[in-house]
Amino acid sequence: MTGYGLRVLVTAASRHGATQEIAVAIASRLTESPAGRAAGLTAVAVPVGQDADPSGFTAVVLGSAVYAGRWLESARTYAATRAGGLRQRPVWLFSSGPIGEPPFPPDEPHDVAAMLQLTGAHGHRVFPGRLEKARLGFGERAMVTAMRAPLGDFRNWTDINAWADDIAAELVGATTAPAVGRP
């Protein structure tokens, strides 16, 4: 079997757009990575709210913004509703949300262990997010002010691209490796 024809769905839940921008960057990098180009890999980024069916894809990258230590409800619902299809293909998870230097909070979201088990994912990465007051609602702005949360874009595109490169290499390697017991 060759790596040609690999299709990857990158789907994410985003409240203010930063996590969806990460999903778009991951999809783009999967396609443009050295392994992705060599194998003809294609990836698409679809907001999780569109409930994309994973069955037409070789692999899935599922992500969510994190608020109050948890994934957004739409991402949790997608994982639960699509668990059967997700478990039949390679899946990777990512979270976006910590802010500042160093990123805070440093811990993984509370529900990641359950998401890993539910989806059978190969792994999970936490990426720093973006916090801009202009994109927040009144209640969110009040909370940010009270917490003295640092404002800014803390996303590290080099780390995001490197992770996508690793996923592409793993996918291409898995589809081009000879079967066990065959010459």
Which residues make up each language-model segment?
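Structured loop/turn residues at secondary-structure junctions
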Residues: 14, 66-67
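Short, charge-patterned binding micro-sites
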Residues: 51-52, 63-64
